[in-house]
């Protein structure tokens, strides 16, 4: 069975929400509704702080360098403003798996590590980063990656 990998609600996170927005509904205010759902969910986690929403428009994800808001989000990560990215699905970020793999590895290698949580797939990149038996070779460091200990020293992982 597939393990669910989620960020630990007891950890302090500065969150950037990435949305690829393409309204296919009859509702004009769908984006506001979508943002409210994220705000309501984050409000349930007192140690989580919403930094900003990063919204790129379009039905499909471009390559990362073409997504202005994704680039702004990555810059905020590198500047220490965001340490957890939450987005609906992998396909929102990039259509190129190698590009996403490199990006998630670079983020996980930061000090402190920066994770990405993909809601639809229920994948949290730092869970596999810290726990060897959860490792997915498409997204995460290879077996020789030994910078951090195998145990979860900071309580960043919640496995349900």
List each language-model region with its residue ranges.
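Short, structured surface patches at the beginning of a domain
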Residues: 1-160
